[in-house]
Amino acid sequence: MNKIKKFLNKFYLDRNEKEFIRHNKKIFIPKPNRSKPLVLMELNESSANLISYSYMASILEKKYDATIFSFIPNVPRSFFKKSMWELRRIFGYKTLRIFKSFGTDRLIIPSLSGPMKIEVNDIFQKKISFIKTKDDLENLTIFGILFGDLIYDYYLNYYKEPEIDLSSKKFRQHLRFCIGLIVFWNSYIKNNDVKAISVSHTVYSNAIPSRIANNYDLPSYQTTVEDIFLLTKDRLFAFTEFKDFRSVFQNLPANIKRQGISKAKE
């Protein structure tokens, strides 16, 4: 009964959500046009981030004169899960309704075409033979892009296991699944006029679209309730501003440097 209630709650807006949608419709007046370039926004259910998502989407839409598409990063792992996402799209999943209120025009649910499945199998057969150690996995590249760290961490997170057995059937299935995501997003970003992308995380499978966007020199962002991070080929992760501290410190006035060093010694 609780599971049914939880599922139904995904379709019904509470008072605050309704108010937020009214606010968005007053503030944001998008003009979707599918002949325009695209900005992709990951459909994320984190309530705390939705306000920043709405303003970020509006800024990117205006900057690139683009249409906003939302997306889920993963290919649904079963027919049932894919059906659930289709039902959410058709009957008004509440998070999707919130996204539509600030301008998203379509929800992308990844799926693999016949040629994509052949490509996935070819890549899998080539890569699996080279993965002998966990370091091999962590350093795995596909299309010249580093994905091994994402595949590794996503396995541990998804299966809630402390380590990977590289010889297991479960790992082989997981690797094939992740290659499917990579093939889909590489094809989508390569063959559509995508101008920018916003993701919820820079780890796990969520980061696959951003890594591919970076490879095509497209701006990608992690948008949170407090921060927005620009991701690049050289800066794959959010929260890495500490790497700039030395250069920032060197550009400070001498008296500020002295005060800071003195304070640090206390």
List PLM regions with ranges.
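Short, well-ordered alpha-helical scaffold segments within catalytic/effector domains
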Residues: S54, L175-N186
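Conserved N-terminal ligand/cofactor-binding loop architecture of enzyme catalytic domains
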Residues: M1-E42, I59, K63-I179, V225-E266
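A generic secondary-structure micro-motif detector
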Residues: S46, L175, S198-S200
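A short, glycine/small-residue-rich beta-strand->loop->alpha-helix junction that serves as a flexible
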Residues: E42-Y53
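Short, hydrophobic/amphipathic alpha-helical patches that form generic packing surfaces
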Residues: I51-K62, I208, I212
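Conserved nucleotide-sugar donor-interacting segment of glycosyltransferase catalytic cores
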Residues: L181-L236
